[in-house]
């Protein structure tokens, strides 16, 4: 039987044995029989499958099609899956720092969805969060300049209340940024040979081989790059593994089966300043880690396993729950298991044989740099599935902006988890620096010392980070922050923030008051509520706030107030809300001044209609009336 399944079997059988040896527990005995039958079934499919290496796309223009399809993941019936240009998962996108990239994302599914560029620093309207919905049969075309450092990023769906289902079905992919600093280092970068992307996830299947999608289910079977029982052949030299936790909820405590040392060279936001040696690294949902492992000490033909050493983790570790039954049970819970089998092959030409002593020269923000401090508390969840986890007792509402941040502010956020369960916290737009765990700077692990966009907040702890919100502002389109467990974010463990530009004023070239459009015409002595739409040209793309009330002249009694918005880069419209009551008819005149331009709009007020609507006569002849 495969080593992976032997580990599962021995752990589960041992657990059930100790729970039943002193008591006649029919439920546990039945569970034991079920597990043994499952393990025998597993043994029939224990052969390894070659790890699928995602195909690549590079350049500045990318065509991506999201589609529903089928995948042969198990013996028997095919599994309904979704992918990007593939049956499961998507291509690896190679981009260069400084380039402007154009994405052509077509949704060929029957459901609406989104694609979020996880870890990317980009305008909010291009971010691909819950607001950038791609309906079925439509094309979304975001574009932005790559400002990120070289590193391993990814893309995945982010439609509110559908993220769990779409992630489970397989939508996602890697995005690798190159830059001159990383390219100058002697690092493995022959993609698919000594530079391997590894997406870790697991799934549970029903009786017809379909994925089980519920918000409390851990997977029972590993899928590494969508490959069950995956193995890969790697050369006898230093190799680079770019590992992503693409799970729904499970964490991984990663290491090698022979306990060999490896070197962490990067995490979410790019390279660390110096390598960190380790034999274990915890990787939570959404996090990435780049490691170098020396296979030069092995012989050709040797094999080893990349393992998840998930047994005996601290209470609250996602996937550390004991047992295979119950709401949170899983065959992979609280055990050590294989995530990738590795076979050592011959050395390639021009191998990498050492680890660079210095990788980068990152300068990080500190607590002292922060001018604004914010606190978030993870709440809810204590009463089970009917009380979902949220932030600050507030469930996500797509119409509510939870935080407003000023452009170029450096902020310190502290996320506190007084809850029963550990969570991962992800924020869009920025890379941050973790500065303290439980208020202690020295408690931050070396492996998480670089730029991050995801951090793990264990139960009963708090974690602080510092970030600068620069380059992009938009008073209308928000970014997200959320737990990166797909089930939790779908249930409302998410908030949103906007970045306001208070330093740059909105400007326009022309203002077309003479062609203003009015939603309605006011009548004297009648309360009026309407709008005026005024066209402009030459907008500079800057956000603006609600304006002060402008009182009418000529006919008085009305006020016009500019509605908040963001200027287009070019032509667009300003909208003013007009309210009030006039005493007379005539022309109400408003003096508009905006963005360096002034003009008048004129609104015609009609006369008051008669209050008495009874018929009017000039005389009445009552002669002869008795």
State what each model feature region is.
Residues 47-292, 312-314, 324-380, 462-466, ...:
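Histidine-centered copper-binding motifs that mark active-site loops
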Residues 145-151, 294-300, 468-475, 579-585:
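Short, surface-exposed loop/turn segments at beta-strand-coil junctions that are enriched for proline
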Residues 106-110, 244-249, 381, 416-420, ...:
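Short solvent-exposed strand-capping/beta-turn motif centered on an Asx-Ser/Thr pair
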Residues 153-158, 297-312, 474-485:
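Short, surface-exposed ligand- or partner-binding patches at beta-edge/loop junctions that are enriched
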Residues 150-152, 238, 301-303, 462, ...:
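Extracellular Ig-like/FN3 beta-sandwich strand-entry sites
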Residues 117-119, 125-130, 134, 263-275, ...:
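Active-site pocket scaffolds in enzymes
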Residues 1-35, 42-45, 501-626:
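Extracellular low-complexity Ser/Thr/Asn/Gly-rich intrinsically disordered segments
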Residues 117-121, 248-262, 426-432, 545-555, ...:
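Short acidic, flexible loop segments centered on an aromatic residue
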């Amino acid at each position: 039987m495969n080593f992976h399944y032997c580990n599962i079997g021995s752990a589960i059988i041992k657990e059930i044995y100790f729970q039943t040896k002193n008591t006649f527990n029919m439920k546990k005995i039945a569970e034991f029989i079920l597990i043994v039958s499952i393990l025998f079934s597993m043994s029939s499919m224990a052969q390894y499958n070659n790890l699928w290496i995602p195909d690549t796309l590079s350049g500045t223009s990318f065509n991506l099609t999201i589609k529903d399809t089928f995948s042969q993941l198990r013996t028997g019936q095919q599994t309904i899956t979704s992918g990007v240009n593939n049956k499961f998962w998507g291509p690896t996108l190679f981009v260069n720092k400084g380039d402007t990239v154009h994405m052509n994302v077509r949704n060929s599914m029957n459901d609406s969805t989104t694609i979020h560029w996880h870890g990317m620093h980009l305008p909010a309207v291009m971010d691909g969060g819950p607001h950038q919905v791609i309906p079925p049969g439509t094309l979304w075309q975001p574009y932005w300049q790559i400002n990120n450092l070289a590193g391993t990023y990814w893309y995945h769906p982010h439609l509110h209340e559908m993220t769990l289902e779409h992630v489970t079905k397989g939508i996602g992919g890697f995005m690798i940024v190159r830059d001159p600093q990383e390219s100058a280092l002697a690092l493995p970068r022959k993609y698919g040979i000594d530079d391997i992307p590894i997406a870790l996830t697991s799934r549970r299947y029903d009786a017809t081989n379909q994925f089980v999608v519920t918000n409390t289910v851990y997977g029972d079977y590993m899928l590494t790059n969508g490959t069950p029982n995956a193995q890969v052949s790697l050369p006898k030299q230093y190799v680079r593994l770019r590992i992503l936790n693409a799970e729904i909820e499970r964490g991984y405590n990663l290491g090698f089966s022979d306990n060999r040392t490896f070197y962490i060279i990067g995490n979410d936001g790019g390279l660390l300043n110096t390598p960190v040696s380790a034999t274990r690294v915890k990787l939570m949902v959404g996090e990435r880690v780049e490691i170098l492992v020396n296979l030069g000490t092995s012989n050709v033909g040797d094999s080893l396993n990349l393992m998840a050493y998930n047994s005996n983790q601290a209470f609250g570790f996602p996937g550390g729950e004991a047992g295979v039954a119950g709401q949170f049970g899983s065959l992979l819970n609280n055990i050590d298991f294989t995530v990738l089998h590795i076979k050592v092959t011959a050395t390639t030409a021009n191998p990498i044989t050492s680890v660079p002593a210095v990788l980068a020269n990152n300068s990080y923000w500190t607590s002292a740099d922060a001018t604004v401090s914010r606190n978030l508390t993870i709440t809810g969840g204590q009463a089970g599935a009917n009380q979902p986890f949220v932030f600050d007792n507030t469930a996500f509402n797509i119409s509510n902006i939870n935080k407003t941040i000023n452009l170029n502010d450096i902020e310190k956020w502290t996320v506190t988890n007084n809850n029963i369960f550990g969570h991962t916290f992800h924020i869009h737009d920025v890379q941050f620096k973790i500065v303290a765990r439980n208020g202690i700077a020295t408690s931050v692990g070396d492996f998480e010392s670089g730029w991050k966009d995801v951090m793990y907040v264990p139960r009963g702890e708090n974690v602080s980070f510092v970030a600068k919100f620069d380059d992009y502002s938009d008073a209308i389109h928000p970014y997200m922050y959320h737990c990166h467990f797909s089930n939790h974010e779908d249930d409302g463990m998410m908030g949103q923030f906007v970045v306001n530009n208070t330093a740059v004023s909105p400007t326009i070239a022309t203002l077309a008051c003479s062609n203003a459009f009015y939603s309605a015409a006011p009548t004297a002595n009648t309360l009026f509520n309407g709008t005026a739409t005024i066209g402009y040209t030459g907008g500079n793309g800057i956000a603006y706030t609600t304006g002060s009330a402008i009182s009418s002249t000529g006919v008085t009694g009305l006020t016009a107030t500019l509605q908040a918005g963001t200027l287009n880069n070019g032509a667009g419209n300003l909208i003013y809300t007009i309210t009030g009551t006039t005493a007379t008819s005539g022309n109400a005149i408003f003096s508009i001044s905006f963005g360096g331009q002034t003009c008048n709009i004129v609104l015609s007020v009609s006369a008051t209609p008669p209050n008495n609507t009874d018929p009017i006569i000039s005389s009445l002849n009552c002669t002869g009336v008795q």
